Amino acid sequence: MKILSVRAVALPALLLPLVSAAPTAIAAEQTMVVTAAPSAVSELDTPAAVSVVNGDEMRQAAPRVNLSESLGAVPGLQVQNRQNYAQDLQLSIRGFGSRSTYGVRGLRIYVDGIPATMPDGQGQTSNIDIGSLDSLEVLRGPFSALYGNSSGGLINATSQTGAQPPTLEASSYYGSFGTWHYGMKATGAVGDGTHAGDVDYVVSTNRFTTHGSRDHSGARKNLANAKLGVRINDVSKLTLLFNSERQLSEQDDLSVMMYAGERETTQYQSIPRAPQLKPTHAGGVIDLTRHYQGIDTRWTHRGELLVPVTFTTGLDYETMSERRKGYENFVMNNGAPQYGEKGDLRRNERNLMWNLDPYLQTQWQLTEKLSLDAGVRYSSVWFDSNDYYITPGNGDDSGEASYHKWLPAGSLKYAVTDAWNVYVSAGRGFETPTINELSYRSGDQGGLNFGLQPSTNETVEIGSKARIGNGLLTAALFQTDTDNEIVVDASSGGRTSYKNAGKTRRQGMELGLDQQFGESWRLKAAWTWLDATYRTNVCDDASCKGNRIPGIARNMGYASFGYQPEKGWYAGSDIRYLSDIMANDENTAKAPSWTVVGLTTGYKWSYGKMDMDLFGRVDNLFDRRYAGSVIVNESNGRYYEPAPGRNYGIGLNLAWRFE
């Protein structure tokens, strides 16, 4: 059982406006703008591996509960639903994040500019409201390192902006395993957004409940998202999350963004009484409260220095304070343990983590066809722990650590034609242990794992992007060498300890296609080959050099084809493939490969000012039995988390326009 509450607010004064580049010679409605890249340009012109997923497409005939429903077409992204809503999705980009047993690790996540990743690198996707999402961008490769610590990849979610006419929407979905999801959303605007006093707004609320496909996997979640924008004058806009945009001049922009939040978690773990009685055991109940805040200031200048150039320099500061307690997950009743009750205190500590990162990014238009993007970030992370639970057999485990690293990245892009770009990029990444990874030492030892060191990686990538008719074809080859890779040491009874694994290598290839035929037919396809191996031995009893890194599929494939008119009947199908996944370092256990098929159909119509959408779907059409995810290096051999069999769902969406 887990109880989680999250509160966050951003308090910016001035937010950097998007720096638009010249569009390519294609229809505007076919251009997806990337804001997670070094500057806001089209997906075709971005000198990095990036994918943009439209929010309307993510909501099409979908439950709107998990990102795993709609991200299969993103190359290099392995997203698996654990069917365990206490642990969030298992999400990795090019193998980064695959070891996480809780939340999202090794990646940076932003929601409307607010980090959904804590300063220590631990993130979550459960706070992303699919119902009000405008777009979601996935940035892979060297440039993600410019976002600082734990940037093996970047996920940038952007909420919708209200527009005229005002609209009220209601959505509902019912599916197998007692699954319900329903929500309300109001959007609108006063004015056209270009004059002082103009206002836009989006307010979204929804509720999700399920009995779960496995025993004891029921869950419920309430989620709300609100966004309010106010045009202050012709060059300033205030967005209440809160974000504000101000252009100092035609050449200069200044941005200051502040945010703060709180997260509270209480989790009861199924651990027998005997292990909890050891003097160094932290108990079976985790009780923690986190307060986090940050500020990001940046200045952008556009001008000429022999050639057109854009400079962005800034300073990013983040801090987090955590109060972590542990209790026995039982009380004695008539001489017998009664589980599920908070017992005696077994852990009490206060952890502080903060980082301070200056950074510089530049863009040079060297010739009409050749451009250079380069940047550097100096990442400094400090960690301090104060132990307040000191007893005989459990000494003072207080300690501190600090980590520092230069993170350069660069990319050279050449426009072969107006519709075909090629690029080469390289960069260095840096990943410190999270507080969760420091929380436990191997062998039931007490105290924090200060022997765990940060990992560093170097990546090179070459890529190609081509506009083919009304479609986009992308390809990328990459290699990442990592030193001091952080991997799972042991996992048992809800406790996971970590260790450094020496050297690893990830090399692979990604292909992606998004092709539209005529006005209503759409084909999406993605394929990823990823060879992730240990280059040094990480096993105690045998040599693991050359073994595959567990938790990472070597091959992933996805294809979907659908008929999607604006009104009337629509239908689609998708097929997903995942090759086998090793479950331990020794490569003696693995989850077999699987292929599943899904179908959707629905009907859209309008009556006066009302738009309606009635749909149905079936997932895992052929009732394939497979492991949806694995728990890496689970000490008792319980590696596999089963996925649901064939399951069904129906939904109805209504929207009323106040015209």
Please describe what each predicted stretch is:
Residues 106-107, 114-140:
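Short acidic/polar hinge/loop motifs at secondary-structure boundaries
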Residues 194, 253-271, 415, 421-427, ...:
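Membrane-embedded beta-barrel scaffold of Gram-negative outer-membrane proteins
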